[in-house]
Amino acid sequence: MSPREIEVSEPREVGITELVLRDAHQSLMATRMAMEDMVGACADIDAAGYWSVECWGGATYDSCIRFLNEDPWERLRTFRKLMPNSRLQMLLRGQNLLGYRHYNDEVVDRFVDKSAENGMDVFRVFDAMNDPRNMAHAMAAVKKAGKHAQGTICYTISPVHTVEGYVKLAGQLLDMGADSIALKDMAALLKPQPAYDIIKAIKDTYGQKTQINLHCHSTTGVTEVSLMKAIEAGVDVVDTAISSMSLGPGHNPTESVAEMLEGTGYTTNLDYDRLHKIRDHFKAIRPKYKKFESKTLVDTSIFKSQIPGGMLSNMESQLRAQGAEDKMDEVMAEVPRVRKAAGFPPLVTPSSQIVGTQAVFNVMMGEYKRMTGEFADIMLGYYGASPADRDPKVVKLAEEQSGKKPITQRPADLLPPEWEKQSKEAATLKGFNGTDEDVLTYALFPQVAPVFFEHRAEGPHSVALTDAQLKAEAEGDEKSLAVAGPVTYNVNVGGTVREVTVQQA
């Protein structure tokens, strides 16, 4: 064969899910980004060539009504209008929806239907316990609505979590009708070799056409290599965030991943000019949110502690409130013991907060002398099945302290109908607009929704710094810099003027 006859295969396209409109600002600035700071980038995001755009779900719904006085449903409708060519994607906590407890199946159905009706395309459905029973109904509702159901595996490390176990869970999700599988690494624990092994094993077991999406955070500094190894193993789509909203406890930069693949036999086919415009847009608005910025850069200690950053800050605030910050090391050591007693659940919302709070209680009050209601529920099965057996001694204590009995069935099977009750209660609230969307807002956040409904007409309340405030801060910094060096004074001492130079400390 002559050189001219050598076949050159086309690079394999790797899809990209852009996270800047949801998880990027949730991870970097406590989910405080206002809609007004996102709309200007939507046209470029829509035309950049992403596989999907994550823009809703997770903590954004709560943040909209609690902090920003924004209607989350209006946010979704606006994204749909501004990005007509994009697959819009959300993160859904299975039977928990976007709240912090399990909801009756009818509420789940209504929520999924309304999300689809308002413009959502891809539903990434996960469960904090990796219990497929807690994902089944939500996924069925997504399929019924004619949308993309993405079954999710929460990645964690423990003596009971293995490649084989993750492959088995992937099979269960596929049997439920999952259109794709997401491997979700929320704490940046996924090292390169396990990334390769898990992706390859799922592909080898269920076929190369099985779509797998990979979500990694960047907190530990190793996961960009993990993305590369996953791509080599056949992963179809990876999650990234535009560079001006990336790294730290956030995610790997979109442009870096795209550039990394050039010349490797893989490509993203993204429009670099559009990426640079998106980058510049968020680079300009990010300083407005600096008071909410996470201070975390790279932290490899997570590999040992298994404690994600959000969980760490939550425990610190609890200890600070009790004047016991000196107990932090003891609490850090207690977390793995509490997690083991609970059967090694992945540390993701809400299990991370529940395990962390119980660790604080154990250190402050003695081991399981006082158990939170939520931790007792985990021990008794009310959050679902744990990956491993729970400590029977702690289960017994949970029974005694809570007055409840252990369960083995799907927790939502025990819930009474609640839609009619929620509808009637919501209808009595000032500012309620009569829609199912408002009923859902009340059902998910019954303490916050009444205040939001009453003040919704006032419009969004951005918590970002204004341009005037940023300018004033910059001018203040310049004045500080002006006196940062040695300062010379003329001092009159007994009628004699002396020149004194003072060096700034």
Swiss-Prot record:
Uppermost EC category: transferase
InterPro entries: Aldolase_TIM, Carboxylase_cons_dom, PCB-like, PYR_CT
Effect of residue 184 to A/E: Loss of activity
Entry-linked Gene3D superfamilies: Aldolase class I
Annotated GO biological process: gluconeogenesis
Cofactor: Co(2+)
Keywords: Cobalt, Metal-binding, Transferase
Cofactor: binding details: Binds 1 Co(2+) ion per subunit.
Residues the record lists as binding substrate: 22-26, 59, 184
The record's account of how the chain is modified after translation: Lys-184 is carboxylated in the free enzyme and helps to coordinate the cobalt ion. Lys-184 is partially carboxylated in the complex with pyruvate, but is not carboxylated in the oxaloacetate-bound form.
Highest taxon of source: Bacteria
Pfam families associated with the record: HMGL-like, PYC_OADA
Sequence positions bearing N6-carboxylysine: 184
Documented EC number(s): 2.1.3.1
Transmembrane segments: none
Disulfide bonding pattern of the chain: none
PROSITE patterns in the record: PYR_CT
Residues annotated as domain Pyruvate carboxyltransferase: 14-276
GO molecular function annotations of the record: metal ion binding; methylmalonyl-CoA carboxytransferase activity; pyruvate carboxylase activity
Keyword hit for Metal-binding: yes
SUPFAM superfamilies to which the protein is assigned, alphabetical: Aldolase (SSF51569), post-HMGL domain-like (SSF89000)
CDD domains in the cross-refs: DRE_TIM_PC_TC_5S (cd07937)
Assembly: Homodimer. Transcarboxylase is composed of three subunits: 1.3S, 5S, and 12S. The core of the enzyme is composed of six 12S subunits. On each side of the core there are three pairs of 5S subunits. Each 5S dimer is attached to the core by two 1.3S subunits. Thus the total number of chains is 30 (6 + 12 + 12).
Function: The 5S subunit specifically catalyzes the transfer of the carboxyl group from biotin of the 1.3S subunit to pyruvate to form oxaloacetate and 1.3S biotin.
Protein's recorded name: Methylmalonyl-CoA carboxyltransferase 5S subunit
Source taxonomy: Bacteria, Bacillati, Actinomycetota, Actinomycetes, Propionibacteriales
